[in-house]
Amino acid sequence: MAEEWLKATSRPIRAAHVDSAVPNVARVWNYLIGGRDNFEADRQAAKQLIAAAPVMPQVAVASRAFLRRTVSYLAAEAGIRQFLDIGTGIPTAGNTHEVAQAVDPSCRIVYVDNDPVVLSHARALLRSSDEGATSYLDADARDTQAIMAGASVTLDLARPVGVIMIDVLNFVEDAADAVGRLAAAVPVGSYLAVMQPSRDERLAVAAIRWNQLAATPVFLRDRDQVARWFAGLDLIDPGIVEVHRWRPAPEDAELPEGVPLLGAVARKP
């Protein structure tokens, strides 16, 4: 079995097949957060989403700020020194390893995505501190076995891990199953940080439009659905809240409030 896992996780990252005529989740999100790694089809799709839901740019900004705060909390307050970032997206400012290694340069990070475009950008742009490490794993967010086997090359899975699932579970139909299997696989003392667009009427039209445009459907969820992901885990205060309410930092004072994103962090007891 170990040899089979090694073969599965040591395969080279797939060559990026880029279809610039079809909107891509990572590239559309890259446009929404002000990035330049996108094509005309992505920009047009993003503009259609903004037309349907003018809150979309604020959603993107709030999501990145939540990522920064959760990683900072895990590194600075919870003492986590290794991270598993699933559904990485195209790198931009304030990536997980940058935030974590600003607290402790020895932090180790594994980025996971199954989009070859994302992985090619990650290889080119994500650079660790000399004291720490970053690696990049080609795996689906639902494939817990492949994720854990691949992560074990860089992370010590006998020690707690900070699992980051931000901007990914909304593209997973059976998110509860994916979260549950990952929570079962990581060591006691590990943390899980998640974000999920809520069933807000401002996003409903945008979700319908996105599902007409793209091959990867998006799923909106309510607080009760998100709460079920944390069965058996200890939620960290303030629990499941709109992301701007999750331990806001002074530098977030100008961020918009009431963005329809739910966020939470929990610890495995």
Which sequence ranges carry the predicted segments?
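Rossmann-like AdoMet
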Residues: 1-139, 144-145, 149-157, 183, ...
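A short SAM/SAH-binding and catalytic strip from SAM-dependent methyltransferases
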Residues: 141-142, 151-176
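Conserved beta-strand signature within the Rossmann-like core of class I S-adenosyl-L-methionine
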Residues: 162-165, 178-179, 186-197
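Short "lid" loop at the C-terminus of a central beta-strand within the Rossmann-like core
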Residues: 168-171, 197-201
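Class I S-adenosylmethionine-dependent transferase superfamily signal
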Residues: 182-183, 230
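Short, glycine-/aromatic-enriched active-site segment of Class I SAM-dependent methyltransferases
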Residues: 199-216
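Short alpha-helix
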Residues: 217-242
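Core SAM-dependent methyltransferase catalytic element
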Residues: 239, 244-269
